[in-house]
Amino acid sequence: MTSPASGDDYAPIPRSALGPALNDQGYYVGRVERNLYYVTDGVYQSAFLTTPDGVVVFDAPPSIGHNLRRAVDQITAAEGMPNTVTHLVYSHHHADHGGAAFLFDGDVTRIGHEETRRLLLRDGDPARPVPEVTFADRYTLGRR
């Protein structure tokens, strides 16, 4: 029989491994590069890209939920860019990555792999609307 582990059995977690400090609303938004940002609640992440035509959001975890919208509004206001979310890209179909996708309704175009679409149709979850645009191997969004 084994005994349960105690706090003395593990090395302390280094402060740098804890991630960035969250604001009073429970999220942190950081710049990856130029107009690409990430948002975290300390567990899950999302990302968004600001453009002159609007914002492209990558994943919408329910644990971040409305804070994702707040982060988009905060950054676009500071950068003088439009805050309209025009596209939402699903990384995959799991609810822990797309469960707040319903918050971005209206004219948003949802993009996902064709298998993501199939699985979202199967699941029938209204919080995760099915992507209108799908791809098999790759998809390019925007002008080239």
Where are these regions (language model features)?
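N-terminal pre-domain segments of enzymes
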Residues: 1-26
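A general marker of short, structured functional hotspots
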Residues: 6, 23, 33-34, 100, ...
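Hydrophobic small-molecule pocket/channel-lining residues, especially in calycin-type beta-barrels
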Residues: 8, 64, 128
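Phosphate-binding glycine-rich loops and adjacent basic patches that engage nucleotide phosphates
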Residues: 9-11, 28-38, 98, 125
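Intrinsically disordered, low-complexity regions enriched in small/polar residues
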Residues: 12, 29-30, 39-40, 50, ...
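Active-site HxH/HxHxD metal-binding segment of metal-dependent hydrolases
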Residues: 20, 67, 73-143
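Alpha-helix-centered segments that form part of catalytic cores
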Residues: 25, 29, 35, 132, ...
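Conserved beta-strand hairpin/beta-sheet module of binuclear metal-dependent hydrolase folds
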Residues: 26-74, 79
